[in-house]
Amino acid sequence: MIWFYAKQGHHLRCEIRHLTDGDQFDLVITDADGSERVEHFSDSASLTRRTLQLEAEWFHQGWDGPFGREY
């Protein structure tokens, strides 16, 4: 699952990758400058909490979104 956020012509990308080893996930965040960071989660509940936290932070910073895309 991939989400995009937009602000004044800049974009953030947030991707969730379900790993093949059990209930594990990577959250890949690509910032507007192209830098990328990865956060690892060992369960979906932790991933959901972090995703909601990021959405709230980005909303308060003026980012529009999320705009989703499934693949």
Which role does the model predict for each range below?
Residues 67-71:
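Intrinsically disordered, low-complexity charged/polar segments
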Residues 42-63:
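A short, charged, amphipathic alpha-helix used as a generic interaction element across diverse proteins
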